[in-house]
A protein has these predicted regions:
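The canonical Cys-X-X-Cys-His
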Residues: 60, 64-75, 126, 130
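Gly/Gly-Pro-rich "capping" loops immediately C-terminal to redox-active cysteine motifs
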Residues: 51, 57, 75-111
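Flexible coil segments in periplasmic/lumen-exposed cytochrome c-class electron-transfer proteins
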Residues: 115-160
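Bacterial N-terminal signal peptides
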Residues: 14-27
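N-terminal secretory signal peptides that target proteins for export/translocation
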Residues: 1-10
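Electrostatic cytochrome c docking/interface patches
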Residues: 35-63
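Signal peptide processing junction and immediate N-terminal pro/mature segment
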Residues: 24-40
Length: 160
């Protein structure tokens, strides 16, 4: 006999409610947050998700040839003064990092004689060109030059 005979029905209802609610709680815990802000999300996309447009890559190619090819060469192979921007060494050095890191590196260190003179949009367009040149697929939407947007895109060398 229960020490609380009057509350037997309440205990049974509570136990039944807990059993029914447990899968719901587990599902909520496993699901991504519904109100996640851009600053809280990380790396939801990769360079294989068509994160730039062909038109943007075209602008980036023009900018690259005007501002970068002098040191990095038109073939992006690099030279005595500058590293390569294509090939296995380039790809492996950026693999797993965010496009925000690549953007920041270019924006703050290029050109080496006067770093920081290129606009964020110029750098983003050049990144679109680098991605296109290295075989990543273009899409319908341009790569956005905001840090939050770039922070959510990982440079991944192997296709999914």
């Amino acid at each position: 006999m229960s020490p609380f005979p009057r509350h037997r029905g309440l205990r049974a209802a509570g136990l039944l409610g807990a059993i029914i609610a447990m899968p719901l709680w587990a599902g909520l815990a496993a699901a991504p947050a519904m109100h996640t802000t851009a600053g809280e999300r990380h790396n939801d996309r990769t360079t294989w998700d068509s994160v730039f447009s062909a038109a943007q890559a075209g602008r980036g190619e023009t900018t690259y040839k005007q501002l970068c090819a002098r040191c990095h060469m038109e073939t992006l192979a690099g030279g005595d003064e500058a590293g390569e921007l294509t090939g296995s060494a380039f790809m492996s050095s950026w693999n797993g990092q965010t496009l925000a890191a690549l953007h920041e590196r270019i924006r703050t260190s290029m050109p080496t004689d006067t770093p920081g003179v290129y606009s964020s949009q110029q750098v983003t367009d050049v990144i679109a060109y680098l991605l296109h040149f290295n075989g990543f697929p273009p899409g319908a939407v341009e790569l956005t030059h905001t840090n939050d947007a770039l922070q959510n895109i990982r440079f991944v060398t192997t296709p999914p």
